[in-house]
C-alpha cells in the first residue's frame, strides 16, 4: 500500500560515500558483486550476497533475459564558439533536415543565429548554426549539413571528432578504455548517449554459459537519453514527466516472451530500460504485448502495475532518480532504501560501472 511519502522526490534520497562510486568496471564483467533480493515483505531484507557470475545458477532453463541492444555513440563534440572560446555539444536526437537537439555548454553563449565551428582537422572545420532553444529540455537545436539526418549518417563525424559521453561522476582520466567497457556485448543499434548499464555485467563467457543451460536471451532497443538520466527536480511526483526516448520491441522478442511464459518460465529484464520498453509496448497494445516502434515517456513509480516482466537485473542508482522510482515500484520504497543501506555497509560499488542487484519474482510486491 502506498503512503504519502511515496509521491515525494525527497523520499528517494540516500547518502553515499564518494569512494563507493565505481570509476571503472571489474576486471571481468561478471565479477561484479550481486545482491540477490529474495522473498520478503517491506520490513524484511531476505537477501543473498553473490557475484553476477552466479546468476547462471539462479535462473532456470525456461527463463528469459531481455537485454537492450542500443549502442552508445560518441556524441560529445568539442566546438569553437562565435566570439572565441571553447564549448561543447552533446547530441541528443535528430530532428530532421540536418537539425539535432543538443545540450550545449556554455548554453548562455549559444543563442539563436550564432555560428559554431567543429574542427574536423587542422585545415577543415564544419560550420554549425544555433537555430533556437528547445524550451522543454533547455537544449539547443543545432543545424548541421542536411545530409546528417540520422545517427548512421553522423557516424563518420562522431568517429573522427566525438567522445564517449561518460557520466559526470566518472573521472575519465582514471578509468579504462571506455569505448569498449562502456558498451554491452549486445550493442548493435547506435543511438544511446548513456549505456544500459545492467547489460555491462554480461560477459561473453556468462552469455554462452546461460545459453548452454537453456536460458534464452531476447533483445529490445531503447536509445538511452534524457528520460533515463536527467536528474528529477519537482518534489511532487504526481507531476512527473520524462523526456521521450525511442524504443523498438520486435515480433521476435514478443514470441520469445510468450514462449517463456507458456513454458512456465520467468521474464527477467536486464536493466530498467528493458523494463520501460516492454511495459510501454504492452500499454500501447491496450492490454496485449504487440510489436512497437516509436517514442515513449512512460513513468514507472510505486503503484505501477507490471504486466510483462517478472524480475530485474539492475545496478545501484543515483538518489532521487527515475530509475530509483522504478526499482521501488517493484519492491517498495522502504525496502529499497533498506537494501541500499545494506549495499553501502557491504561496500557495494554504485552507478554505471558498479555492482548489481537481482530482484527475483518472489520479491516483487
From Swiss-Prot:
Subcellular localization, as worded in the UniProt entry: Cytoplasm
Key words, A-Z: Cytoplasm, Queuosine biosynthesis, S-adenosyl-L-methionine, Transferase
EC annotation from Swiss-Prot or TrEMBL: 2.4.99.17
Recorded GO MF terms: S-adenosylmethionine:tRNA ribosyltransferase-isomerase activity
Biochemical pathway: tRNA modification; tRNA-queuosine biosynthesis
Cellular component GO terms held in the UniProt record: cytoplasm
Pfam families per UniProt: Queuosine_synth (PF02547)
Function: Transfers and isomerizes the ribose moiety from AdoMet to the 7-aminomethyl group of 7-deazaguanine (preQ1-tRNA) to give epoxyqueuosine (oQ-tRNA).
Family under the similarity heading: Belongs to the QueA family.
Protein name from the UniProt record: S-adenosylmethionine:tRNA ribosyltransferase-isomerase
Gene that this sequence comes from: queA
Amino acid at each position: 500500500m502506498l503512503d504519502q511519502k511515496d509521491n515525494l522526490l525527497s523520499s528517494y534520497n540516500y547518502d553515499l560515500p564518494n569512494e563507493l562510486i565505481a570509476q571503472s568496471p571489474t576486471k571481468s564483467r561478471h565479477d561484479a558483486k550481486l545482491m540477490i533480493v529474495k522473498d520478503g515483505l517491506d520490513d524484511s531484507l531476505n537477501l543473498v550476497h553473490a557475484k553476477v557470475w552466479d546468476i547462471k545458477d539462479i535462473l532456470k532453463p525456461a527463463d528469459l533475459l531481455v537485454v537492450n541492444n542500443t549502442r552508445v555513440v560518441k556524441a560529445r563534440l568539442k566546438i569553437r564558439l562565435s566570439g572565441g572560446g571553447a564549448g561543447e555539444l552533446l547530441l541528443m536526437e535528430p530532428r530532421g533536415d540536418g537539425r539535432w537537439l543538443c545540450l550545449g555548454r556554455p548554453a548562455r553563449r549559444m543563442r539563436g543565429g550564432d555560428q559554431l565551428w567543429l574542427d574536423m582537422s587542422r585545415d577543415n572545420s564544419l560550420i554549425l548554426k544555433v537555430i533556437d532553444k528547445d524550451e522543454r529540455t533547455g537544449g539547443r537545436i543545432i543545424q548541421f549539413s542536411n545530409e546528417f539526418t540520422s545517427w548512421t549518417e553522423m557516424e563518420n563525424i562522431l568517429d573522427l571528432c566525438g567522445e564517449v559521453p561518460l557520466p559526470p561522476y566518472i573521472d575519465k582520466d582514471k578509468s579504462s578504455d571506455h569505448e569498449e567497457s562502456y558498451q554491452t556485448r549486445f550493442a548493435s543499434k547506435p543511438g544511446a548517449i548513456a549505456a544500459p548499464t545492467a547489460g555491462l555485467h554480461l560477459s561473453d563467457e556468462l552469455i554462452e554459459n546461460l545459453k548452454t543451460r537453456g536460458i534464452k536471451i531476447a533483445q529490445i532497443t531503447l536509445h538511452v537519453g534524457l528520460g533515463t538520466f536527467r536528474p528529477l527536480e519537482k518534489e511532487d511526483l504526481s507531476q512527473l514527466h520524462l523526456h521521450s526516448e525511442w524504443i523498438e520491441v520486435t515480433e521476435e522478442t514478443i514470441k520469445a516472451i510468450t514462449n517463456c511464459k507458456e513454458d512456465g518460465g520467468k521474464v527477467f529484464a536486464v536493466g530498467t530500460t528493458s523494463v520501460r520498453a516492454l511495459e510501454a509496448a504492452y500499454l500501447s497494445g491496450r492490454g496485449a504485448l504487440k510489436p512497437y516502434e516509436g517514442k515513449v515517456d512512460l513513468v514507472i513509480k510505486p503503484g505501477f502495475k507490471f504486466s510483462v516482466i517478472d524480475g530485474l537485473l539492475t545496478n545501484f542508482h543515483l538518489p532521487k532518480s527515475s530509475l530509483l522510482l522504478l526499482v521501488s515500484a517493484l519492491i517498495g520504497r522502504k525496502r529499497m532504501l533498506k537494501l541500499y543501506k545494506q549495499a553501502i555497509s557491504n561496500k557495494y560499488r554504485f552507478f554505471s560501472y558498479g555492482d548489481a542487484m537481482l530482484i527475483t519474482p518472489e520479491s516483487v510486491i
